[in-house]
Amino acid sequence: MGKQLRQMKIKEILHNHDVGNQNDLIRLLDKAGIEVAQATLSRDCTELGIIRSRTHQGFRLVLPEDSPGQIIRGLVGMEVQSISSNETAIVIKTLPGRAHGVASFLDQLKDIAILGTIAGDDTVLVIPLSIKDIASIIHDIQSNLSQT
């Protein structure tokens, strides 16, 4: 099966099922007759902007169009514990295991002032294009993660 058809099926599954993680998604794809490797599914999820967010029912894989952007911002924002910086970079502390989702969300914003992000388990390192823009980038990050 081609990439486009596989990604369409992924979207369909996420719209019709509460999927908690990529392993659950692999099982549902397998039931639909689609075999996919974990690495391929991970790339598909990144390309589709899928994030794993906490809901009242536990964790769930969420497509960006599943909810208005403000809800996704709020979900990702709830995972951020602090934002700090020094003279060269920005560090975002998250709940354990949530840094990748926050970094993915920031990458999806395609902010030209952000050169890139690196995620660990509970820490995101944000590298600015210019150190002169650090205060502005922090403000933009806080605005984009706002729940209001």
Swiss-Prot record:
The keyword Amino-acid biosynthesis applies. It is found in: Cytoplasm. Keywords: Amino-acid biosynthesis, Arginine biosynthesis, Cytoplasm, DNA-binding, Repressor, Transcription, Transcription regulation. GO terms for biological process: L-arginine biosynthetic process; protein complex oligomerization; regulation of arginine biosynthetic process. The keyword Transcription applies. One of its GO terms (molecular function) is DNA binding. SUPFAM superfamilies: C-terminal domain of arginine repressor (SSF55252), Winged helix' DNA-binding domain (SSF46785). It holds the Pfam family Arg_repressor_C. Pathway: Amino-acid biosynthesis; L-arginine biosynthesis [regulation]. Its main location: cytoplasm. One of its GO terms (cellular component) is cytoplasm. HAMAP family: Arg_repressor. Regulates arginine biosynthesis genes. Belongs to the ArgR family. PANTHER family: ARGININE REPRESSOR. This is Arginine repressor. It comes from Prosthecochloris aestuarii (strain DSM 271 / SK 413). The lineage of its organism: Bacteria, Pseudomonadati, Chlorobiota, Chlorobiia, Chlorobiales.
